[in-house]
From Swiss-Prot:
A Pfam family of this chain: Ribosomal_L13
UniProt lineage: Bacteria, Bacillati, Bacillota, Bacilli, Bacillales
Protein's UniProt name: Large ribosomal subunit protein uL13
Highest taxon listed in the record's lineage: Bacteria
GO biological process: negative regulation of translation; translation
Subunit structure: Part of the 50S ribosomal subunit.
SUPFAM superfamilies xrefs: Ribosomal protein L13
Gene name tied to this protein: rplM
Species whose genome carries this gene: Listeria monocytogenes serovar 1/2a (strain ATCC BAA-679 / EGD-e)
């Protein structure tokens, strides 16, 4: 009888990918990146082991938002003090803090447990075209579709 292969944490090979977010839809990019971070594009994917790769996203400020999301999609946060509810539209976040916009979108697509927090640490988002990971020799990743 054969048993299902399960990857061990020590035998996983990790690559570094760099993705240019210029003009790409936020949701399409986020779902692809979440899949890479989890390792679902690898044949040795194991749900409870971190088999994913590192991802660098550049030009986050040039991400595309379809429809009226720039004005109608609202992100809320609360300071836990009375009257401390603050809100921002997706368009404001894209201009003021584009890294946070992408991170929130990708984080929502990862597991909500300790593995998800570990996977999220492998994501590096930059608003401009420069990044500080040249020593890792990242490959350019072409998005599907």
């Amino acid at each position: 009888m054969r048993t299902t292969y399960m990857a061990k944490p020590g035998e996983v090979e990790r690559k570094w990918y760099v993705i240019d977010a210029t003009g790409v839809s936020l949701g399409r990019l986020s779902s692809e990146v979440a899949s890479i971070l989890r390792g679902k594009n690898k044949p040795q994917f194991t749900p409870h082991i971190d088999t994913g790769d590192f991802v660098i996203i550049i030009n986050a400020g040039k991400i595309g938002l379809t429809g009226k999301k720039a004005t109608d999609k609202i992100y809320y946060r609360h300071s836990q003090y009375p009257g401390g509810l603050k809100s921002r539209t997706a368009g404001e976040m894209r201009t003021n803090n584009p890294e946070k916009l992408l991170e929130l979108s990708i984080k929502g697509m990862l597991p909500k447990n300790s593995l998800g927090r570990q996977l999220f640490k492998k994501l590096h988002v930059y608003g401009g075209s420069e990044h500080e990971h040249a020593a890792q020799q990242p490959e350019v990743y072409e998005l599907r579709g």
